[in-house]
Amino acid sequence: MVLLRGVGLLRSSNVTSGGAAATASRGGNLFKCLMNAKRPDGMLVNRRGFHGSMVYKAAMSEEEASELSDVTKQLTGADLQAASKLRNIGISAHIDSGKTTFTERVLYYTGRIKAIHEVRGRDNVGAKMDSMDLEREKGITIQSAATYCSWNKDQKDYHFNLIDTPGHIDFTIEVERALRVLDGAVLIVCAVSGVQSQTVTVDRQMRRYNVPRITFINKMDRMGSNPFKAIEQINSKLQISAAALQVPIGSESNLRGVVDIINRVAYYNKGDQGEIIDKAEVPEDLKDLVEEKRALLIEKLADVDDEIAELFLEEQEPTVEQIKSAIRRATIARKFTPVMMGTALGNTGIQHVLDAIVDYLPNPSEVLNTGLDLSKNEAKVPLVPSIQQPFVGLAFKLEEGKYGQLTYIRVYQGRLRKGNYITNIKTGKKVKVSRLVRMHSEEMEDVDEIGSGEICATFGIDCSSGDTFTDGNVKYSMSSMYVPDAVVSLSIKPKSKDSTNFSKAFNRFQKEDPTFRVKFDPESKETVISGMGELHLEIYVERMKREYNVECETGKPQVSYRESITIPAEFDYTHKKQSGGAGQFGRVIGTMSPVEGETRDNLFETAIVGGRIPDKYLAACGKGFEEACEKGPLVGHKVLGVKMLINDGAIHAVDSNELSFKTATMAAFRDAFLKSQPVVLEPIMNVSVTSPNEFQGNVIGLLNKLQAVIQDTENGHDEFTVKAECSLSTMFGFATSLRASTQGKGEFSLEFSHYAPTPPHVQKELMAEYAKKQKK
């Protein structure tokens, strides 16, 4: 069976239950006991909502834990010592939740930068990690930026490789890239808005790449902030057990510090930039709240950790060390996320997050990374983060720098040395590592060697994003990143006739960003670019102007439609062509039917009995099917969710060849497709709009005008969020309409949800337009 690409497949996540629930199944009536257990403070707790019974899709499986244990046994004391001081982490969140502001404080407190600059600061310097001019102007992160810094905790220096990622859905590939190579992440959630649409997307990406996370609730100094409501949403909407490790001292504009509920200590950030931390006793008016939240934390840990569950049953209060160890185990096993709180802009609570990164996020030796051994039929092999092992690294990001192409590499195994030769597994080419650097946003620091588990960059290596490199001693390949389909296209042409830089820019952008696609449409004689949204394409058009001095004219944004069928149909097609000499002959018989299911990939199958069509011709039929799926007969867009089965046919002893059967299959495909009640599918988007409460009527009216289906509305203290499903074709220009309806105070995010049939009148119009183009 040949599986042809339709909509990208998501990697399935591991499924397991919480630790205490597992203990319950072993201990007979233990679960009943826990249902009415006592809290450490003596209060009886009704346990109907016992979280251990919940299924955490991303939790570590027993098989994964066993493989990881085998890998750890292969590490030397020196390997474990080196790994214990290293953390590879990403900063992820919904747009405007304060990721870059948070990262700026991290760099300042770790001594990496000398002064703090704001994302939209008056000094016009911009945040360190927003190195592109466009990022500083728009106040958003477009590319993920890498840096490294050191943090001293308990008289030990820890080395952080840190990646700040975009929050805008149009740049989601940057988040995918970062999470693919990171061992842990800090998820930032707004204390006012709570879990938002892109928070859910980032959570899904973290699960896809098995990334444990700690959570920081930011913007605690804003009016309407409610960290405990945000924690409830993390539990309910993200379906992962979460509990606070802190409670705030004061609220909103009176926020003065936080209380560490594990150690029962109050911390106040002092100094001009919050760099001085004063330690004090817990304020009297917060003592009850601290005990309540501490009991809740232990209760949550009992759901996901066996050791705490045992203590919980015995009505013993765990020690500080036992609580911290349990948080670490549960976080690394992806069953739990510890929650801290503060305000990045107000310089409160950031240092505690740095401590939590050390305490609770895994080092490279505590994460299972696997490759595929191409010399053993792609057998899965665990990668060992030891410098004694053969080198294996993944090129996860490309950038065009002033010294040529800059390739970011995560070293999974072995070490990478300047001057060494490494092999690109995809192309088989050997390349020399002439320069090796550590990145600090757009600045770089030269190094001679990079060890296992580290992230670096190198120059002069010709490769694509997602390529695997080894030292040539092993033929391992890393599984590639998930790349979503493009949903928006527009035609583009340079204003001047000189198109050298025009082509050069496209080649570079496509190498850098797999979600940015360029093709030439032979019918309209136009160059068409496709991407994840209007902003995504707008940024690339602007970058062409700035970086390549090419001004462009663009057409109207076009929707990437799909074509599909609704009922099965049979086909029997004979392709004959004779014009003297060798002719062409191929006959194919079979059925075409719709494919059900979430992914709706196109499938090509054969069931030929008695060799009526030889295998080499069947392979040509497969190619014909793949080619036919690239351009449907209704409106010329890709085909989705079609299964073609060839179960009979005929050949001619002289005239049959691969081309004949490829042509016959394409013609049979077209005939059967048109008989199968075909439909044009359009992208349906998840829309999330946030705006001040006084504009609620305007926003709902605007969405109704677009025939959006409203799914949910949440009213906050001073703003509301409405979630809806809407056809992408109606969303062009929505940003302008929303600005006008909310006096510029509304914001929205769009994310692809699924494909659905267009209304009949729209399908008619699209088909008529396509037929008109064909005649020209």
From Swiss-Prot:
<dbReference type="InterPro" id="IPR004161">
    <property type="entry name" value="EFTu-like_2"/>
</dbReference>
<feature type="transit peptide" description="Mitochondrion">
    <location>
        <begin position="1"/>
        <end position="57"/>
    </location>
</feature>
<dbReference type="InterPro" id="IPR005517">
    <property type="entry name" value="Transl_elong_EFG/EF2_IV"/>
</dbReference>
<keyword id="KW-0342">GTP-binding</keyword>
<comment type="similarity">
    <text>Belongs to the TRAFAC class translation factor GTPase superfamily. Classic translation factor GTPase family. EF-G/EF-2 subfamily.</text>
</comment>
<feature type="binding site">
    <location>
        <begin position="218"/>
        <end position="221"/>
    </location>
    <ligand>
        <name>GTP</name>
    </ligand>
</feature>
<dbReference type="Pfam" id="PF00009">
    <property type="entry name" value="GTP_EFTU"/>
</dbReference>
<dbReference type="GO" id="GO:0005739">
    <property type="term" value="C:mitochondrion"/>
</dbReference>
<dbReference type="Pfam" id="PF03144">
    <property type="entry name" value="GTP_EFTU_D2"/>
</dbReference>
<keyword id="KW-0809">Transit peptide</keyword>
<feature type="binding site">
    <location>
        <begin position="93"/>
        <end position="100"/>
    </location>
    <ligand>
        <name>GTP</name>
    </ligand>
</feature>
<dbReference type="InterPro" id="IPR014721">
    <property type="entry name" value="Ribsml_uS5_D2-typ_fold_subgr"/>
</dbReference>
<feature type="domain" description="tr-type G">
    <location>
        <begin position="84"/>
        <end position="365"/>
    </location>
</feature>
<keyword id="KW-0496">Mitochondrion</keyword>
<protein>
    <recommendedName>
        <fullName>Elongation factor G, mitochondrial</fullName>
    </recommendedName>
</protein>
<dbReference type="InterPro" id="IPR009022">
    <property type="entry name" value="EFG_III"/>
</dbReference>
<dbReference type="InterPro" id="IPR035649">
    <property type="entry name" value="EFG_V"/>
</dbReference>
<dbReference type="InterPro" id="IPR005225">
    <property type="entry name" value="Small_GTP-bd"/>
</dbReference>
<dbReference type="InterPro" id="IPR000640">
    <property type="entry name" value="EFG_V-like"/>
</dbReference>
<comment type="pathway">
    <text>Protein biosynthesis; polypeptide chain elongation.</text>
</comment>
<dbReference type="GO" id="GO:0003924">
    <property type="term" value="F:GTPase activity"/>
</dbReference>
<dbReference type="InterPro" id="IPR000795">
    <property type="entry name" value="T_Tr_GTP-bd_dom"/>
</dbReference>
<dbReference type="InterPro" id="IPR027417">
    <property type="entry name" value="P-loop_NTPase"/>
</dbReference>
<feature type="binding site">
    <location>
        <begin position="164"/>
        <end position="168"/>
    </location>
    <ligand>
        <name>GTP</name>
    </ligand>
</feature>
<dbReference type="InterPro" id="IPR009000">
    <property type="entry name" value="Transl_B-barrel_sf"/>
</dbReference>
<dbReference type="GO" id="GO:0070125">
    <property type="term" value="P:mitochondrial translational elongation"/>
</dbReference>
<keyword id="KW-0547">Nucleotide-binding</keyword>
<dbReference type="InterPro" id="IPR041095">
    <property type="entry name" value="EFG_II"/>
</dbReference>
<dbReference type="Pfam" id="PF14492">
    <property type="entry name" value="EFG_III"/>
</dbReference>
<keyword id="KW-0648">Protein biosynthesis</keyword>
<dbReference type="InterPro" id="IPR035647">
    <property type="entry name" value="EFG_III/V"/>
</dbReference>
<dbReference type="InterPro" id="IPR031157">
    <property type="entry name" value="G_TR_CS"/>
</dbReference>
<dbReference type="GO" id="GO:0005525">
    <property type="term" value="F:GTP binding"/>
</dbReference>
<dbReference type="InterPro" id="IPR004540">
    <property type="entry name" value="Transl_elong_EFG/EF2"/>
</dbReference>
<dbReference type="Pfam" id="PF00679">
    <property type="entry name" value="EFG_C"/>
</dbReference>
<keyword id="KW-0251">Elongation factor</keyword>
<dbReference type="InterPro" id="IPR020568">
    <property type="entry name" value="Ribosomal_Su5_D2-typ_SF"/>
</dbReference>
<dbReference type="InterPro" id="IPR047872">
    <property type="entry name" value="EFG_IV"/>
</dbReference>
<dbReference type="GO" id="GO:0003746">
    <property type="term" value="F:translation elongation factor activity"/>
</dbReference>
<comment type="function">
    <text>Mitochondrial GTPase that catalyzes the GTP-dependent ribosomal translocation step during translation elongation. During this step, the ribosome changes from the pre-translocational (PRE) to the post-translocational (POST) state as the newly formed A-site-bound peptidyl-tRNA and P-site-bound deacylated tRNA move to the P and E sites, respectively. Catalyzes the coordinated movement of the two tRNA molecules, the mRNA and conformational changes in the ribosome.</text>
</comment>
<dbReference type="Pfam" id="PF03764">
    <property type="entry name" value="EFG_IV"/>
</dbReference>
